[in-house]
Amino acid sequence: MLRWAEEEPRELALDEIGESYARYRLHVPEAERGMMRSLERYGQISPVVVCVQEGRYELIDGFKRLGAARKLESMTRLWVRRIETDDRGAKAAIYGLNRAGGRTREIEEAWIIHALVREDGLTQVEVAELLGRHKSWVCRRLALIEKLGPEARAELQVGLLTPTAARQMVRLPAGNQAGILDVVRREALSTIELTGIVDLWLECPGRIPQQYILQHPREALGRPKAWRCRRGTRA
């Protein structure tokens, strides 16, 4: 349960608000641009949520608002509301506040769980109790991050890889993900095309057909399955 500080919301300068917990949130440029328009038109409607960690205010909820405000010359301060919590509680609060607002994303949940287990040393059972979820749910979210290779994880963090695409990438062995990512960037593949490429890759485990898929992804998608997997060379 959130423990709100016994004080009224207050204004803070933007540079007083830290973003160390932003690593557990997806950066979605389109959403931030939409928030900029909203702030310009209506101003700040509700306070963002912060906690104090090591003597500094750290943002827990309101990352789009802070990111948008930093890009607007007209905004130099934001109203904040503080909760009293430690680092583990802050991570749980990020999950809880977003779930209450109907804004949870599977990948963001996975990042928080990964941090609680791998950084804070909690067991999966302890994380389940902290977040009010079943252990199997925690296990699935943890696997989602741990099956994602470092390059894909980094691109997801900065918004270059969508959560939908990430769910396809984790179907592949970590060692194969970088090659598929290169194809996605080079060919500007859609999510539907990426899904098809991952399906093909798993159906055709041989080196030659997989090289063909990497070199000619759209052509491979248009070929009959038997041709793609057995021949793996261009006609």
Each language-model region and where it sits:
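Helical mechanochemical/support elements of P-loop NTPase systems and associated helical scaffolds
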Residues: A31, M35, R65, K91, ...
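Amphipathic alpha-helical extensions and coiled-coil-like segments
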Residues: E108-E119, C139-A235
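An acidic- and aromatic-residue-enriched active-site/binding cleft used to recognize and process polar
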Residues: Q53, R133-H134, L161
